[in-house]
C-alpha cells in the first residue's frame, strides 16, 4: 500500500504536459488507447425508449364487476356517463364494459374510487 501511495503522490505532482507524455508512453508500452470509445445511439432504438418513458395521459375506465351494491353502482354510472337509468343499468349488466373513454388520469382515478367505494371492480386502461 505504501508503494501505491507514493505513486499517487508522484502522479499528483505531474504537470499537464508530463501527464500527457506519460499517457503516450503507457499506450505504446501496453498497446492500448486511452481514448474513450464513441457510441452512436440509433434513432430506431431511441424512439421506442422515449415512448416508454412518457406517462399515459388519457385512460379508459372499465367496469369489470358490479359487486354486491349493484343499485349504487348503477346510480354512479348514471351520474358519470349522463345516461338515463335504463341505459346505465344495461351498461352495468353488461360488465366487463367500458364506462368512459379518453379521460385524464385524475378524473379516471376519481371515477375508479367512487365505483370501488360502491363495491365494484374497475380497471384503468
Curated annotation (Swiss-Prot):
The keyword Ribosomal protein applies. InterPro entries: Ribosomal_bL12, Ribosomal_bL12_C, Ribosomal_bL12_C/ClpS-like, Ribosomal_bL12_oligo, Ribosomal_bL12_oligo_N_sf. Gene3D superfamilies: 3.30.1390.10, Single helix bin (1.20.5.710). It comes from the Bacteria. Disulfide bonds: none annotated. GO terms for cellular component: cytoplasm; ribonucleoprotein complex; ribosome. It holds the Pfam family Ribosomal_L12. SUPFAM superfamilies: ClpS-like (SSF54736), Ribosomal protein L7/12, oligomerisation (N-terminal) domain (SSF48300). GO terms for biological process: translation. Forms part of the ribosomal stalk which helps the ribosome interact with GTP-bound translation factors. Is thus essential for accurate translation. Homodimer. Part of the ribosomal stalk of the 50S ribosomal subunit. Forms a multimeric L10(L12)X complex, where L10 forms an elongated spine to which 2 to 4 L12 dimers bind in a sequential fashion. Binds GTP-bound translation factors. Belongs to the bacterial ribosomal protein bL12 family. This is Large ribosomal subunit protein bL12. It comes from Rickettsia prowazekii (strain Madrid E). The gene is rplL.
